[in-house]
Amino acid sequence: MNSIELFSGTGGLALGLQQAGFDHKALFEWDKASCENIKENIANGYPGVRDWKVYQTDVRTVNYNGYTGSIQLVAGGPPCQPFSLGGKHQAYNDKRDMFPEAVRAVRETQPEAFIFENVKGLLRKSFSSYFNYILLQLQHPEIVKKENMTWEEHMSLLEKHHTAGHDDGLSYNVVFRLLNAADYGVPQSRHRVIIVGFRSDSNISWSFPNATHSQESLLYSKWVTGDYWQEHNMKKPSEMPLSTAQLRSVRRAVEETDTPLQRWQTVRDAIGDLPNPADEHGVGAYYNHEFRDGARIYAGHSGSKMDEPSKTIKAGAHGVPGGENMVVLDDGSVRYYTVRESARIQTFPDDYIFSASWTESMRQIGNAVPVKLAKAVGDSVITQMKGLVKHNG
């Protein structure tokens, strides 16, 4: 299954989709440092990446017609700053909104499916009309906004076409869902909107993959069986943080189901085997695992606990990652995650390297889609697509 990816960043989404079985024919990204990082991994011969073609370019200048008919999937994460909870919430007034370019790529390549990722701020009530507008454009990509149209006028045109039930031309069946990466084995609480569409003439029936991990299973492992502490050669804490009612609820959730889920992964699961970066002995065996001084707790930014999923890894403002990119150690002290630790929490493989400075690498990692989350969605999509090929074959 051939694919192209827009706004590829440092390659998190691309890696996950490649692991699911998609063959990327082109990755388009404007940011020079992100492109250079992917290219370094290509040069190092990283499996599955070595054949990628990465183009540092403004997607607004890309002509996709050469991919029409040969691409089964278009994927990408249109820049999220217009919708970010940490941004100024400009959305349709923000020139950084690249969803129109995602729609154009779909229109020109006519893929069997697409996968787009964005921040949960996209679902803010203040953006609800514009989000519906995005979905309508993806459903009917050939209904193009004319130069003198406002987005509201274009939306009215799309609504009329949609409600008329026209089945001619290129159209997609589109669904979206807010997913927590922790529910798919990522050691991090990270909520992202995933939009998936299948070409209407494919007649594919699909839904988002079920969660594979749960908070209840983690609590059960800690406070019912104690398995979590045994796995980490730790003594079970004497203080029970759950009430009797909460503990009963956890038991029911785990014991009274036919399909028990795996437990959420924690920071300790992800980085517990790495040497202390402040101790240079043994650190050299791990690339990108250098200590960074200066971490401190301040209001609203207290760092991530070792025995919980990490807080959301963030790109940071003005090149300075926030308290979310710190870890609270067992002695109560805090320090910044190393680049390698952050990469692990985003489920990048250890041999996928980040060659820029700490600040730049943390920015790239913070902007990435967790590899495991991308793979979970990609696995589900490609399974349905292969089933269609088998049925039609």
What are the language-model segments listed below?
Residues 31, 53-61, 178-182:
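Conserved acidic residues
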Residues 3-13, 17, 59, 68-86, ...:
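Conserved proline-anchored active-site loop of SAM-dependent methyltransferases
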Residues 257-393:
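C-terminal target-recognition/interaction regions appended to catalytic cores
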Residues 24-25:
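Short beta-strand element of Class I
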Residues 36-66:
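S-adenosyl-L-methionine
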Residues 28-32, 117-118:
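Conserved acidic E/D residue at the C-terminus of a beta-strand in Rossmann-like folds
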Residues 64-71, 83-303:
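Class I S-adenosyl-L-methionine
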Residues 32-37, 98:
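Conserved short alpha-helix immediately C-terminal to the canonical SAM/SAH-binding motif I
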